[in-house]
């Protein structure tokens, strides 16, 4: 399912951004530790890297927004675009290739996924639950849990999802920053486990 994007046409090579320099030493050291843990889990497989979309100014979409029209939605800032490219660069530098890249239908999620990995597969279950009937949100959450359980049973393979803070909060019972990824897996009882976090500097 193709969804509109707010991104201008862009050569593929522009997505291969390298990680920014000039970070504080303490931040680098902390990031390196989580980096190593997440990489090992992704390489082993049986997990999902679920990212909150990259930086997009504002809190909620404007009244009357439409999914098919990016101009009516919150969109990525320039910093957010750089952040999304850095996510892709991190995976590319480590030769980590997701088996599947899925995205919420919202433009800021589609754009985050596109800048990082190329055009994603759009999945309604990853969409924001705000403004939707409670029954719809509950059904989507069941879909996500089922998909995570399936992904967790496939060693040597991982998926990447791009979604929203509220979705990740409902699914994993934790908060996330813009552009942050949670490495998730389901245990044998189907419970969702956060086994690592990944915050990649822009």
Residue ranges and their predicted role:
Residues 40-42, 150-153:
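A short acidic-Thr-Gly-centered motif at the start of a beta-strand
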Residues 46-48, 157-163:
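Generic beta-sheet signal
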Residues 93, 126-141, 145-151:
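All-alpha RGS (Regulator of G-protein Signaling) helical domain and cognate RGS-like helical scaffolds
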Residues 96, 151-156:
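Glycine-rich phosphate-binding loop signature in dinucleotide/nucleotide-binding domains
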Residues 35-124, 129-133, 174-193, 197-202:
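Active-site-proximal alpha-helix that buttresses catalytic centers in soluble enzyme cores
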């Amino acid at each position: 399912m193709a969804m509109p994007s707010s991104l201008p046409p862009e050569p593929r090579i522009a997505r291969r951004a390298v990680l920014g320099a000039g970070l504080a030493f303490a931040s680098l050291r902390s990031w390196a530790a989580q980096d190593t843990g997440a990489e090992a889990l992704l390489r082993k497989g049986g997990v999902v890297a679920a990212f909150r979309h990259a930086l997009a100014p504002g809190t909620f979409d404007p009244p009357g927004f439409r999914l098919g029209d990016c101009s009516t939605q919150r969109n990525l800032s320039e910093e957010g675009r750089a952040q999304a490219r850095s996510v892709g660069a991190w995976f590319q530098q480590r030769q980590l290739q997701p088996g599947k890249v899925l995205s919420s239908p919202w433009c800021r999620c589609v754009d985050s996924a596109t800048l990082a990995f190329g055009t994603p597969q759009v999945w309604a279950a990853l969409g924001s639950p705000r403004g939707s009937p409670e029954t719809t949100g509950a059904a989507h959450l069941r879909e996500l849990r089922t998909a995570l359980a399936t992904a967790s049973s496939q060693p040597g393979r991982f998926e990447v999802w791009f979604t929203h803070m509220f979705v990740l909060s409902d699914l994993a019972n934790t908060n996330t920053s813009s552009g942050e990824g949670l490495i998730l897996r389901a245990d044998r009882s189907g419970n969702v486990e956060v086994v690592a976090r990944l915050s990649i500097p822009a």
